[in-house]
Amino acid sequence: VTPLELLALICFFAVIRVAMSIKPMPVAAGESGSPSARTVIREYLDAFIVAGLVALFLITFVVRTFFIPSGSMIPTLQIHDVLLVNEFEYRFIKPAHQDVVVFMPPIPTPNDFIKRLIGAPGDTLRIHNGIVYRNGVALDEPYIAEKPNYEMEIRDYNVYVDGQPLDPAVANIPPKSMWTSPNTIPPGCYFMMGDNRNDSEDSHIWGFAQASGTFAAGPDKGQAASFTGHAFLIFWPLDRLHILR
């Protein structure tokens, strides 16, 4: 349900509620001690309108739903899962390691991506035999689908802040450097990976991400992208209802 659809539904029930208040229904003799059907209906409508307004506020300013269209995050997220995404959190705190993040990628697409945050600014990453090492420590990753069968290679990229390229001395890692050797993530950048490592288009293809609203993208991409929010709950289907870790 979009905010506009929810608002239309609230307005519809509000009109019914107002109409029921214009001309009270007569109470039959001997029934003055019990609430009329009209009164009961009005109370239910009041409750629905209040709940709808609260929901409208939440989905407009705090959370949104996100539908999983692909298998890049299997087994954590299955195709057709529906998630709740906190759009409010990253306005005040930085994204954390292992967060499952929704964002617009720096490629020509109208669709959001969803990946896991593996590396943050200042982290040194190395990938060897399918194992990710962050600051010299092998990551415990029980969430991945299977051991990756490739060594990751970063694409050429430039980092843009407020539409201006960052100083190359700060922003650039040597072109197409292999992540089998340690590489330090530049300031303001994040390394995103899908849990289904062998079937995920992520940072090893299109570069780094920034929560501030820009991405470090390859020169052939030419589009900035931004974090939308932190995915925190699978709420559909009901048999998969749980908080994301």
Give the label of every model feature segment.
Residues 2-41, 66-67, 75-245:
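Soluble "head" domains of membrane/secretory-pathway proteins
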Residues 38-67:
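Transmembrane alpha-helices and immediately adjacent membrane-cytoplasm interface residues
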